[in-house]
């Protein structure tokens, strides 16, 4: 049984990120793995879901909604999320959700608090937004070889990783965290943050399977599926990025 907790699913869903949750459900069901989805909204401590969920998911949102979620995440859900990550639960945070994983998000005159789950800070830059198709090379524990993640990025924030943070991958095409470092995303144990959306997992089902296996604590590979259509979607996403 895979137990998933979606954080702010109605507010943080600007880029059809709900597709990531649907993909996780289907890939579990097709393998005969049970799937439960819980939601935690504004003002709701993680409580039992924080203690029992195997995977937490947070997507991207509009500026106003992201601001509301930032304060709630820091003041209401922070301790529960830290405890879950410490026991090995997986976390996938996309775009705005990724920005909220760090210490803070500076917006000029205002600074939004973060969950402090990973060592990073984000600053909204005066320059143009970083927009376009993107591909990164990723190396994750348990995978026999390096893999490519492909998607779309659209962010005004520049994310800088601290000394205790490890990037998710190396940029092959696109801008990445800040347009200059050559890195994209962050990974700490089973916690992953990334700017890639579109949504991310339907274009990169290998990452969905990695998250499922890690969340369930499985060492052996998941049973293979007929991924012809999924492979075609991945090839098209890479083609769009020029990789």
Spans of model-derived segments:
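Glycine-rich beta-alpha junction loops
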Residues: 8-10, 156-158, 198-200
């Amino acid at each position: 049984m895979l137990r998933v907790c979606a954080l702010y699913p109605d507010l943080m869903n600007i880029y059809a990120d709900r597709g990531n949750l649907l993909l996780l459900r289907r890939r579990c069901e097709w393998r005969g793995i049970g799937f439960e989805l819980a939601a935690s909204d504004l003002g709701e401590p993680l409580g039992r879901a924080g203690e029992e969920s195997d995977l937490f998911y947070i997507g991207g949102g509009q500026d106003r909604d992201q601001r509301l979620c930032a304060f709630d995440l820091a003041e209401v859900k922070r301790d529960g999320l830290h405890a879950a990550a410490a026991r090995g639960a997986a976390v996938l945070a996309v775009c705005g959700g990724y920005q909220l994983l760090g210490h803070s998000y500076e917006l000029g005159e205002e600074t939004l608090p973060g969950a402090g789950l990973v060592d990073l800070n984000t600053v909204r830059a005066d320059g143009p937004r970083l927009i376009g198709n993107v591909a990164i090379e990723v190396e994750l524990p348990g995978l026999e070889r390096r893999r490519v993640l492909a998607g779309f990025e659209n962010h005004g924030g520049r994310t800088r990783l601290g000394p205790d943070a490890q990037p998710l991958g190396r940029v092959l095409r696109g801008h990445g965290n800040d347009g200059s470092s050559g890195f994209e995303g962050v990974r700490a144990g089973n916690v992953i943050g990334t700017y890639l959306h579109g949504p991310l997992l339907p274009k990169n089902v290998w990452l969905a399977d990695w998250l499922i296996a890690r969340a369930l604590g499985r060492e052996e590979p998941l049973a293979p599926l007929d991924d012809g259509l999924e492979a075609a979607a991945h090839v098209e996403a890479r083609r769009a990025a020029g990789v």
